[in-house]
Amino acid sequence: MGSRNSSSAGTGSGDPSEGLPRRGAGLRRSEEEEEEDEDVDLAQVLAYLLRRGQVRLVQGGGAANLQLIQALSDSEEEHDSAWDGRLGDRYNPPVDATPDTRELECSEIKTQVELATGRLGLRRAARELSFPQMLHQRERGLCHQGSFSLGERSRVMSHFLPNDLGFTDTYSQKAFCGIYSKDGQIFMSACQDQTIRLYDCRYGRFRKFKSIKARDVGWSVLDVAFTPDGNHFLYSSWSDYIHICNIYGEGDTHTALDLRPDERRFAVFSIAVSSDGREVLGGANDGCLYVFDREQNRRTLQIESHEDDVNAVAFADVSSQILFSGGDDAICKVWDRRTMREDDPKPVGALAGHQDGITFIDSKGDARYLISNSKDQTIKLWDIRRFSSREGMEASRQAATQQNWDYRWQQVPKKAWRKLKLPGDSSLMTYRGHGVLHTLIRCRFSPTHSTGQQFIYSGCSTGKVVVYDLLSGHVVKKLTTHKACVRDVSWHPFEEKIVSSSWDGNLRLWQYRQAEYFQDDMPESEEHPSTPAPMSHPSTAFSSPQ
């Protein structure tokens, strides 16, 4: 019970068996739909499942009567294991050319973003000023008090989105997680090789200063989080424990927080830490939310929250009183920590509109707005003051139940490309243009300080980082070079830098680089004045071996 300390190395269990398509998946499908939607070598998939122990063949009444049955295994959304078909590489996610912004136009978040980016009250021509035009206005004294306001600075930074690869670190296995600390001084990366790497990001650097071997890891580290004081980090895996470890000091002290689950095979897919560092929140494959109190050194809550795996959890703001959860039932639920009880597990409300399982949730940090990524290949923006009706919840549940494809190794069905809004969908906005395959891909709001949270960015199964304009829904940037899906993305809280963590084993830092120089700015002796001059990246000097 409670926690345990460990200073000795341990590797944990190996790769657990995978499940077949999710519980409750639809079983019927017409031959016409099969031919239209399937682009998979079924023999290859069957051989893979047999090799992995997912299914087995048994003889029926006759010698030629063979039956395929599922091996006893929990359904699990996070396991690709040795499947390297990389079907996502062949999938080109359709981009929504005309996003529906009607709900967003009437919402308060539109005013918030316009205020944070210095566009509130401006005419359209003034909103679309180029950077040189903004500088000219400042020189003429037309800016507030002769200088750019905070909103105008955020608008200026929108002209300098990351567009160039500045640093790469390569691992021997898949990179699963990668996040900046709250102050941006540390970047933490978690890889399938059971190693957590910490990078020093102070003064423009990106230099690895510590590698820590994770304990009690089954298959891979699935999620990581920093403590609010920045002195420790937490990680979860296929294990009954969430571990906490020190960042600084000699040696590594791993403390295991025992969640005491009822399931034999147990995994925590998502973790979050309260603002005071006291409580640790986890979402697990048994459909439950777990709360561990670090002061009492015990699990204090086990809430039956979703009908299937809980893939995402997040606190709404710094008060840590309101929290969000999302699962494979396609429902996002809102909870009040002060009223959560094991004997009466009722959320204060629910948000419905997705047609398949939710893979990640990110809060805007104001206890009002959040975004969710989903296997239905969309991101949705929500306002928790607009809960869904029973009709909407039932429509989402039914849509998720009728899904009869497995996102881990199958192509996206063409019917999932349709721009369809379910009855009772209470979302403010839907973003399309990225792929969600193979794993629980993350999406996040861009930082407040540098961008005014005017962007939403996401990983992609096709190896891209996709950046959306929050208000218009259009894709404004795609960062490409990864050879496999990008599972996690993290934007520096104060600088124009994005780090992508990919299943191709690469960690990549993206930053802004001027693509072209005007001829007047080039030396007269230059042979090719229109050719971009080479630019050295200080961070590349810190490229570290694994």
Curated annotation (Swiss-Prot):
Keywords: Phosphoprotein, Repeat, Ubl conjugation pathway, WD repeat. Residues 1-40, 79-100, 521-546 are annotated as: Disordered. Interacts with DDB1 and CUL4A. Residues 80-89 have a biased composition (Basic and acidic residues). The keyword Repeat applies. Coiled coil: none annotated. WD repeats lie at residues 170-210, 216-258, 263-302, 305-345, 353-392, 435-480, 481-520. Pathway: Protein modification; protein ubiquitination. May function as a substrate receptor for CUL4-DDB1 E3 ubiquitin-protein ligase complex. Pfam families: WD40 (PF00400). GO terms for cellular component: Cul4-RING E3 ubiquitin ligase complex. The modification Phosphoserine is found at S73, S75. This is DDB1- and CUL4-associated factor 11. InterPro entries: DCAF (IPR051859), DCAF11/LEC14B (IPR017399), G-protein_beta_WD-40_rep (IPR020472), WD40/YVTN_repeat-like_dom_sf (IPR015943), WD40_repeat_dom_sf (IPR036322), WD40_rpt (IPR001680). Residues 1-10, 537-546 have a biased composition (Polar residues). One of its GO terms (biological process) is protein ubiquitination.
